Amino acid sequence: MSCSSLCAPACVATPTPLADSCNEPCVRQCPDSTVVIQPPATVVTFPGPILSSFPQYAAVGSAGVPAVGSGMGGTFGRGAGFGGYGGLGGYGGYGGLGGYGGYGGFGSCGYGGFGRGYRSLLGSCGPC
C-alpha cells in the first residue's frame, strides 16, 4: 500500500532575504481498504486514513560578505552605517568593532565591551 503526498512544495533558501521561515500544512491521503466478508459475499469499503502534520522550517543566514558603505546604515545592517562595519551596530561604529558597543570603540575599551576603561579622541585606550 502506498500513500500519495499532498504536501506543498518545500521552501527554497535564497540569498535574499537573509531570514526566512515557513509553516506549511502537510496532508497524506492513503488508498481505501477493501474487505470481503463470506458467506454470502459482501464487499465493505473503508475509507483510507488521512494523515496530517504541520512541519515548521526556519533559516537565518548571511548572503555573503557585507558591502562597505557609509551613512545611517551603510546601509542599514552592513557597511559603515547603522548596523555595519563603521556604524551604529557594526565594525567601527555605535555597536561594533570600533564603535559604541564593540571591539574598538565606546564599548571595547569602554562601556559594555571586551575591556574596562574608555576610548580617547585619539583612539588610544585608558586603563583597559
UniProtKB/Swiss-Prot annotation:
Keywords, ordered alphabetically: Keratin, Repeat
InterPro entries: Keratin
GO CC terms: intermediate filament
UniProt region (3 X 9 AA tandem repeats, Gly-rich), positions on chain: 83-104
Annotated GO MF terms: structural constituent of cytoskeleton
SS bond list: none
Tissue specificity statement from the Swiss-Prot or TrEMBL entry: Abundantly expressed in the claw and at a low level in feather tissue.
Keyword Cell membrane: no
Keyword hit for Repeat: yes
Residue spans of the Sequence repeats: 83-91, 92-100, 101-109
Domain of life the protein comes from: Eukaryota
Family under the similarity heading: Belongs to the avian keratin family.
Other facts: The avian keratins (F-ker, S-ker, C-ker and B-ker) are a complex mixture of very similar polypeptides.
PANTHER family on file: BETA-KERATIN-RELATED PROTEIN-RELATED
Protein name, as recorded: Claw keratin
Protein source organism: Gallus gallus
